[in-house]
Structure formats: structure tokens, C-alpha cells
């Protein structure tokens, strides 16, 4: 749009679940997008089959299958989150259980980038750089951090550069 992007975080879970938050507040000086986390875990915010964000919410992180946002005016795919790995959510047997997915030597990261290209989103939100939160970083395999470290060296930094190049030239 040529306007500055203003991302408004409404918390996780979000408190606006019954309508497009742009109906609550918008500002024509900006491209306003509302953000929440883990749309995969907020069933009222996504289509269960397509995983499209119902009200155009951008997700700053997802566990499990990637959700994606669609521009509410143009109806074009707009944004998707990409992670290298994720921890489990819930307990096996629970209806909302999401099993963990390790890095698998970069396979998960590459697959998530491939899905972003396939869906055709304009914006990829890459999680995470330097997040040293114990609950989220279970071990090296399920850590979503991409910064160079003693375990992987700069492997994921190089992979990130490679995938960004592919994404920009899709």
C-alpha cells in the first residue's frame, strides 16, 4: 500500500474473537494488521480445513500446521509464520493436542517456507531469534531459535538467507 505497517498485538489468546478487529479500530495513515499468537490453538479464529485466519489476524507463532492470513479487502494471501521446530502443546489424547516437531536437519523449516510460497503470502514472519525462554526451548532439536550457536553453528542463519532469497523470487 505504500503506507507504514502498524502491527497491533491483542494478546494471546486475543479478546476479539467474533469480528474483524479492523472494525474496532483502523487508521488510514497506516496499513493496520492485528496480531495474536497460536491461531492453531484458537479455533474460533481459523477455518479448520484451509487454516485461513477468519478475521485476517496475523499469527506471530503457530505450533502444528501453519495458519495464514488473507487481506480482508483483496482476499489475497497475506502473511504466514515460519518456524524451525516447535514443542508439543497439550497432552496426548486431548482433542487439541499438537505433537512436537523437531528440526529434522532443517526439513521442517524448508517445508514451512515451501508452504508459504505455495499459498502465495506476501509476508513471512520468521520465528525466532535469540529467544532463551526455557519453556519454549525444550532441547536443541525442538528449539525454534535460528541464531548461530555452538550446536548448529550458522547452519540455520545460512538456511534462512537461502529461503528468503527463494521467497523473494517466487
Label the predicted regions:
Residues 1-170:
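Glycan-processing catalytic domains of CAZymes
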Amino acid at each position: 500500500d505504500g503506507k507504514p505497517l502498524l502491527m497491533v498485538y491483542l494478546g494471546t489468546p486475543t479478546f476479539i474473537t467474533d469480528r474483524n478487529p479492523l472494525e474496532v479500530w483502523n487508521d488510514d495513515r497506516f496499513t493496520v494488521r492485528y496480531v495474536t499468537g497460536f491461531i492453531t490453538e484458537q479455533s474460533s479464529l481459523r477455518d479448520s480445513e484451509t487454516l485461513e485466519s477468519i478475521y485476517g489476524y496475523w499469527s506471530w507463532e503457530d505450533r502444528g500446521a501453519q495458519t495464514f492470513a488473507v487481506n480482508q479487502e483483496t482476499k489475497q494471501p497475506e502473511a504466514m509464520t515460519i518456524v524451525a521446530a516447535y514443542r508439543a502443546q497439550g497432552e496426548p489424547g486431548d482433542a487439541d493436542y499438537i505433537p512436537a516437531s523437531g528440526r529434522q536437519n532443517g526439513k521442517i523449516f524448508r517445508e514451512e517456507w515451501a508452504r508459504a510460497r505455495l499459498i502465495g503470502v506476501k509476508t513471512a514472519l520468521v520465528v525466532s531469534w535469540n529467544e532463551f525462554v526455557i519453556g519454549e526451548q525444550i532441547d536443541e532439536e525442538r528449539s525454534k531459535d535460528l541464531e548461530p550457536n555452538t550446536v548448529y553453528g550458522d547452519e540455520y542463519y545460512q538456511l534462512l538467507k537461502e529461503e528468503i532469497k527463494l521467497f523473494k523470487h517466487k
